[in-house]
């Protein structure tokens, strides 16, 4: 009888212990993480252009197969009046994604008018014990990554040497007087990133980390070393990185080279009018630019791909980590190439984004409490137009205004892409809503199919229980 009671007691204790271990394992297995992937300037036109080129008109991209798809309305306000502004830049839109607040163009995680610092999801996640990382194909001091971990009144205050009377491309771009350390501010973007609690930063922008504005002042790269970052300047150096190291990877002086370019580095061109057509629009001829091929960019060969950087980031952030992580990955030059009217460049960078999405979804498949969101900050200039006008039978030359690029596709067709938002050397952003894609968690957690852009922050913060 005593033996039976002892057996029952032992069995009960064993079951309780097993239940406790199971609960612990379940808790460990349910570690929440968020991977936010941003295609800068990626809208439905850019996605369709890339799909037509990469997969064919009947093909699909990985984005098309994600369980959730919705749209976000972009919000911007005027710096002085606070009235709505209907076309954004990357600074205020990244601020919306990073902080859930609406601000004016050019601001990095600071409020319009009052210039208050706005807490970012990176800072909130750090405060809750999550590891955090930023990966980009631009300079890591550029507007999108900066908005997740820095606070300045102007996106152009990227280094200690660029805080007062900033001039870029021959244009005066203002100052960040109140952000100067001498005035009690946090310093430039590069200094703030160097002193941040981020676990990982990968991208370009080396020049902003070695610049200073006075003899004896520490550079941002010195501050980063003092803050425990292992600094690498070449992808070959990753073999020296321990999985638990804090990493600052600076793989270019400014932005990383793009994957594809037009042959002979061609961009969109202006249709050529005959002399007679210049005299009278109803007569003569207008000749469209000759079609181009997209080719591999030789400058890209030694550059880490966005896929490689994304894999490394996830490895570093997840290593021996039961607390989860927040990772922002940006394909930056969809936008930059569109500004330059270079569709092949934008196509290649959207292809890079898709590769990064593949890496994120693969990780989420093995770690099912990982939320993966893919979105854009704003829309852009490129649009698909008829290669042969619908009105070509009219007895006059009919052609697209602005500049046009005609790209040979793998199907043997010609994809005509128009840029006509500006008479300046660079194209403008546009003001439509942006797409947002998600994995199954976006569905199960009931992310709305229509939302305001700041709501993306709220959804991520709620999922990570940061509020």
Whereabouts are the PLM-identified features?
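Paired acidic/hydrophobic, glycine-rich loop segments that form the ligand-binding mouth/hinge
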Residues: 133-134, 201
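Boundary at the C-terminal end of the N-terminal hydrophobic targeting segment
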Residues: 26-30
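Active-site-adjacent structural elements in enzyme catalytic domains
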Residues: 32-54, 113-129, 139
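A post-motif C-terminal structural segment
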Residues: 31-33, 42-95, 141-467
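N-terminal secretory signal peptides that target proteins for export/translocation
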Residues: 1-9
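Noncatalytic scaffold domains of N-terminal-nucleophile
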Residues: 79-113, 119, 123, 134-137, ...
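Bacterial N-terminal signal peptides
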Residues: 10-22
